[in-house]
UniProtKB/Swiss-Prot annotation:
CDD domains reported for this sequence: GT28_MurG
Disulfide bonds: none
Listed pathway(s): Cell wall biogenesis; peptidoglycan biosynthesis
EC number: 2.4.1.227
Name of this chain's protein: UDP-N-acetylglucosamine--N-acetylmuramyl-(pentapeptide) pyrophosphoryl-undecaprenol N-acetylglucosamine transferase
Function statement: Cell wall formation. Catalyzes the transfer of a GlcNAc subunit on undecaprenyl-pyrophosphoryl-MurNAc-pentapeptide (lipid intermediate I) to form undecaprenyl-pyrophosphoryl-MurNAc-(pentapeptide)GlcNAc (lipid intermediate II).
Alphabetized InterPro entries for the sequence: GlcNAc_MurG (IPR006009), Glyco_trans_28_C (IPR007235), GlycoTrans_28_N (IPR004276)
Amino acid sequence: MKKKIILTGGGTAGHVTPNISLIPKLKELGYEVQYIGTKDGIEKSLIKKEGIKYHEISSGKLRRYFDLKNFTDPFKVLKGIMEARKIIKKEKPNIVFSKGGFVAVPVVIGAYLNKVPVISHESDMTPGLANKLSTPYCNKVCVTFPETLKYIKKDKGVLTGTPIREELFLGNEEKGKKICGFKDNKPIVLLVGGSLGSKILNNLIRENIEELLKKFNIIHICGKGNIEKTLENKEGYAQFEYVKEELPHFMKASNIVISRAGANSIFELLALAKPNLLVPLSKKASRGDQILNAKSFEKNGYSLVLEEEELSKKIFLDKLNYLYENREKYIKNMKNSSFKNGIDNIIDLIEKYYTMKN
């Protein structure tokens, strides 16, 4: 009998890339891999590139704040549950793996209604709303931080680490520089604003561009629709809406990285031992998970943190220069970390549940 698994997760790239990192190993073990996502989420374009079957369902966004859509989106979620249940009943997967995000809730419930085992993964230190709603229907919940286990029912939580894409380790420094058109040997700052971009980070770089270019070349991943036309031919500055194949080369070429503090991103930086300046989303714009992630990494000596509330030109440039001058200390701390890539732990758990069901 053929092994079959359905993956789900979406809304941002952080809910998709960990799933993508599992696909090669799953295929190697003989699994037919399929995906359930939304009709127009970022997961659709990312997964289509992987050449696996993609199923579309409806899904409403889960919000912690007042919005008129809060009155209509629950009906979209109910519709999504019915659609996911129908897909899962037809495809008969042995297991469902969820990476969270609002699309995951209907899929997890749909699997539960079909008596299909579900394993989910929470990257952040505290569970997101989608994973909180999904947990009662999951057999196991994988976590990245040991501190997260206290939020999960004891018999469900498993410390696995987060899965890191193998291709990230295969970057070529010269190729990265060539793509960006850099001709000198200035140190390189890579800014990663996330798949949706970050207005604050984009402005931070662009408002200080002249000062930064005196010392650094800059690779700026700014998010969809955020290209600044007036800077398109600026020497030493390369901007991209979103990258995939190029990212390993950009990571390899960069000396320091500026990033938000989503768990997937920061654990990739840790795995690559890249000195980093983290600018976590403020509590006004999030549930505060990125602040907790960033503080944990700063405490362990892996990162330097700049909170949005203390943003100023002077503090930003001072911290960036401090990070560059002390980069070897951060590299050493990261290389001495006990962190391990979570791929094997998660795959072992998937295999365990496949064996139990069959």
